[in-house]
Amino acid sequence: MVIVLIMLAGMSGDSGPGAPTSEKPSDATPSSADAPVLFIRDYAWAYEDTAWNARLAIPKAYYDFYRSRPHDRLENYAQYALSDYDRDYLEGLIGDFREAGDAKDYTRTDDVLNVLAFVQSMPYTPDKLTTGYDEYPRYPIETLVDGGGDCEDTAILAAAILNEMGYGTVLIRVQGHMALGVKCTDDHPGAYYEFEGARYYYLDTTCKGLGIGQVPGEYTHSAVTILPMARQPRMDANFSFLVEDEGPVNARCRVHCNVSNVGTGTARNATVYIAGLAPGQGAGQAWAPDAYVSIGDVGEGAAGWVEATLTIPRNETTQIECVLYGDNFEPVEVKSGLFYL
């Protein structure tokens, strides 16, 4: 027997036994008593001879959601810039930049520099001081609510904004520092790095006044790592099992496997393999029947569970295994300890 329940991500959802629910924060307001708590944040910056300002109202539920998300994706900080759920609030800020550009007849270069000036205006705050962690990369919503951050936080925010505005962007990691690159035409002046056939010009979000292609002196000759902007689902799994119907020869074992997408973007064609391994019968052997449970696509922030019932021989060494795999994420393998019934 196989059972599947996935809790789908969405703005809001039904609740109750057997109904899909969501990890994603809801900003629905069914009544005034349920009105969300909002963070109101005002920002002021200047580009060339013009002073600009913007105001954002960000639900506390969204901030809390991102605070609870994993902050250990140190292999590619670009993932923090690509979450599906903060696009609505970034769009409000992006709308301000677009209106500003239209009002001043800004070129595309001006638009980039205006975003850069906005991010450079934010206070630099070390992670250790503000969070207690040596490294705490912030999601864009966190940086906007906190009103600043360190180099990777403001680089992530700038990359998220420019990416949504249609600019090709990458993150640029140098020793002890994070910046970003913006895709420009080949005749643009300044320092650039080639990546996948394109030139990405250096932007520093913590050094006020530096423009496109201007690298701080201490990083001029540093080796760099380019971090592409691509969503990367990251799946998590754990399981428990319950022994049922112990007979003289076999026992039935119900395995309950929890799955969740803690990365960015949608995990495609997820499947869980559930088996009772039989190490005494040889490497890779499993008691029949094992089970393949198809989940399908799992959205960012979605979580749920699958179940399968296995037949386990009595008095034989057994180990339960669950393997979660799919098209665009790294497989996750979890096993129990050895046991016999």
Feature map (PLM): residue ranges:
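Secretory targeting signatures
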Residues: 1-33, 180, 257, 267
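Short beta-strand elements of extracellular/lumenal beta-sandwich folds
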Residues: 249-266
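Terminal connector regions
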Residues: 286-291, 310-341
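Secondary-structure boundary elements
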Residues: 75-146
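Low-complexity, acidic Ser/Thr/Pro/Gly-rich terminal tails and inter-domain linkers that flank the onset
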Residues: 226-250, 341
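Short proline/glycine- and polar residue-rich coil/turn motifs
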Residues: 294-304
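Short acidic, flexible loop segments centered on an aromatic residue
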Residues: 266-282
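Hydrophobic/aromatic-rich core segments of domains that either
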Residues: 153-232
